[in-house]
Amino acid sequence: MTNAPVTNARTDRFFNFPVTILIFASFMLGMSEFVVVGILPDIASGLKISEVTVGNLVALFAFVYAPCTPIGSALSARFPRFATYLILMGVFLVGNVLCALAPNYPVLLIARLLIASVSGTLVAISMTFAPDVTTDKYRTKFIAWVFSGFSIASVVGVPIGTWVANTFGWRVTFYLVSVLTTVLMISMALVLPRNSHPAKIGFLRQFRLFFDRRIQLGVLDVVCGAAASYVFYTYLSPIMRDEIGVPEQYLSIGLVIYGCACLWSNLYGGKLADKGRGVEPLTHIRPIYCVQAVCLCLLAFASLVPAAGALLLVALGMLMYLQNSASQVLYMDVAYQSHPGSVNLAASLNSMSFNIGIAIGSAVGGLVNDLLGLAWLGPVGAIFALFAAGITTLLRPYIQR
């Protein structure tokens, strides 16, 4: 394989151009994934279908995202990284253009599933650029900022996309995503490193990574942590409206405030992940899970003191993603140390695990809401948080002294 002129883009500055491009890539992936929630009524009206039918796009997106992420990442390890990354970005671009042009729901569904099939793999490949675009001291900061691209998409991208849809039509939102993606791809072609080391082991052998006890516990921890949050987060708007008493016209402001708390959570999670290597950073999250469990239990009483309930939601937003960088460090360090041919696959595990947790948390939350009501969502989520805390304890014997 021939190296292009750009082979290593590391500098002493963290926010160099390649790093900024990769953060912007995660922002675009997040905006494309989440914007459907904001423009759901517009799509339903435009295609003359029910909002429930459009809402199914969100669940089906996650359903395809979770299995395609590890499979796509393992396959991508067999090919030159730079070319694979640009090709998958091209698929992402085609999916968004197809969304904008979709004449009916089946075509829109196919387009969304096409986007879902490559999004997780793109995140995983982004993570593998870390050694080439930044120095080791910024490694966890890089991971945190790549994840934060999704939070920024929730806080900034989705409101912009919603405003564009309300003003010019929902198709223009997808055209906007497509134009920005085109600019992003041109920038990637100019500045991203082109050196890579394709895996020399077979496709199936990469999945031996899953037999590593540290990986198993790490995946289970992220699943439980995500489920703990999404039991209540799925019903965040109804909780704000019915339990805390936020007026309907101020719900969007409340969601932006919550999104800012989540952004802080991702960024501070990067600082927590700096405390050690391998499994160690994730073991430090145990007390955070315990605090999260307490906050979730207290959420049951939010309607009694609405102001305190609002502060509680902000606190839960600040706790929501603190494990992200620590778990990514675990996956990557274990892979580099014990499974060097499975690095791409390891880089995909956080996205895969979190989406499984989202699916479980959302399903459990729906069941609890139907049977017991909104007030019980927090206490049930606390059970998952305590499970996550227990799993971090099981990881302690694997800390390398």
Task: Pin down the residues of each PLM region.
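Helix-to-loop junctions at the C-terminal end of transmembrane segments
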Residues: T69-P80, N266-V279, N369
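Primarily marks hydrophobic transmembrane alpha-helices of the MFS/SLC 12-helix fold
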Residues: Y85, L108, L282-I285
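Paired small-residue
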Residues: V91, G95-L98, P106-I115, A307-A315
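Helix-loop-helix hairpin linking two adjacent transmembrane segments in secondary transporters
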Residues: Y105-V107, T135-P193, Y235-D242, P247
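Cytoplasmic helix-loop-helix junction between adjacent transmembrane helices
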Residues: A111-G149
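A late C-terminal transmembrane helix in Major Facilitator Superfamily
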Residues: V334-L372
